[in-house]
Structure formats: structure tokens, C-alpha cells
Amino acid sequence: MKTYKIGTVISLAIAFVAFPSGFLYAQKKRAQKTPGANQANPKDPGGHSAKGVEFAKNKEYDKAVEEFTQAIAAEPNDSKNYFNRATAYRGLNQLTEAFADYSKAIELAPQDARAYVGRGEVLLSQKQQDNALADFDKALQISPNDPNARRFRGFIYISKTEWQKAIDDYTVVVQKVPADGGAWERRAFAYRSLNKYKEAIADYTKAIATDPTDPDGYRRRAQAHVMAGDSQKAAEDLKAVLKIKPDDVDAQSRLKALETRANASPSPVTSSPATSPAGSPR
């Protein structure tokens, strides 16, 4: 399963930063219909925004910042250039600059949910959960089903142990992005925290399906089986972990404990300490 790192969610951010390139491509396609016409995009004098997008896609964030800075100089009231430069700054881990640019983008386009999401991610990476939550809330007022805003707000709700709210947010995420293994896993954790083991196991199974080679998926489901009192299925999952990672000491230890207790007594195994999901939104 892929992990979405707080503050450096560049895979997500590129989906945002690439948005202008789609617009530029459409402009060029229309210009090509007129032979000899000037194909320059009037919304991007000098082509700096388009160049910045390409640099950002290639993770050349310093060059992307330079291009977006020139785009801002040419079009200082175009919010997308501030948004894109903020994304590039995040790629360089220059969060103060990223925050300032997201704020400027919001000032210029207060109904663009993406800038609130980006600024919220910066705040979240700086451990300002309440301020980040306010930005995600605002983004969702504008775009109620934005999966990124829902994903990160769900992470905050998990951190605050507001399990049902987290479930509600991650439900939207998995509906919009069913291949998001991290969202399935986090909703499973929230269900498990409410002692809803059947639902948790079903979600862990969905998470495993997105990446069957990840041993941690089976490990998490094994723990849910243990908490549900099904040591046999827990053992099967731990064996699956060891099939992928034979030297996994944790899985070896847990499996041995299960087998020892099963041989010693027919009573259900006492659950081991709860394992929390990874420390960043996924």
C-alpha cells in the first residue's frame, strides 16, 4: 500500500499542479485549427506556467519554482501560479513559502477548494491540527466530496479518536478512489476501535486487495481476527506475512504465541496491544 506522507504528498500535489497543463493543451489544440496562428497561450505569457508544470512532474522543484515565479511576474492575479509554486515549494520542503503562496491563491480565488487543501496539508505537517481542520472544512464546504480533503480530515479525526467522523470521511474516499488501500486500512482501524470487527476485517481485506504483496496488510487483519476471537484466521494471516517476509520476527513471535495458546487451552487468545495505523494519512 502506498503511504501518503504529511507535508510531502507530491503524488497528490502533482495531480493538482498538472491541472494547468491540461488547460494549456486545450488552448494549443484550438490554436492548431488555424494555420499560421500564434499558438502562444495568452493566459501563460512566455510559457512559464507550462514549463513549471513539466519541471514539477519531473520533481525538479527548484526549476519549477523559478518558472512559476516568472509566471507570477507576468500574471500576478492568476491564482494557479501561486498554487503551483506552493506545490513546488512543498516538494523542496519549504513550508513557510508554500503556506504564503497557498494563502495568496486563496485570496485571489477564495472558492477554489484545492488551495485550502494544500494549505491544510502544510499546517498538518507542522502539527497544527486545528488550523488544518479549519482549512479542510472550508474546502469541503466548497467541494463536499473532495477525496483529498476527506482523506486528510479523516486522518485528523483518527488522531482525535473521533472514530465515526473518520469512518464517514474515509467512506467518501473509498467511494471516489476504491484503489486507495490506505483509506481502506484507516477506515478499518476506526471500525476496529469501535469494536466493529466484522467491518474492520472486511476493510482490511479490501486494503490487502490493493497490494497483496504488503505484509503489513495481513498483519493488521490478523490483529483484527485476534480481537474478534478467531485465532485460526489470525494464524493464517500471520503465515501469509511470513510467506512474503520469512524473517519477520514480529509475525514469528505472534504466530508462536497463537499456536502455544491454542495447544494449551481451547479458550480464545487475548489480544495483543492495538496496532495503530502508520503515522501519516494514507
Task: Outline where the language-model segments fall.
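Helix-start (N-cap) detector for alpha-helical repeat units in TPR-like alpha-solenoids
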Residues: 45-46, 79-80, 113-114, 147-148, ...
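Alpha-helical segment of the N-proximal tetratricopeptide repeat
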Residues: 43-77, 87-91, 121, 155
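Register position in tetratricopeptide repeats
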Residues: 57-58, 91-92, 118, 125-126, ...
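Structural marker of alpha-solenoid helical repeat scaffolds
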Residues: 74, 108, 142, 176-177, ...
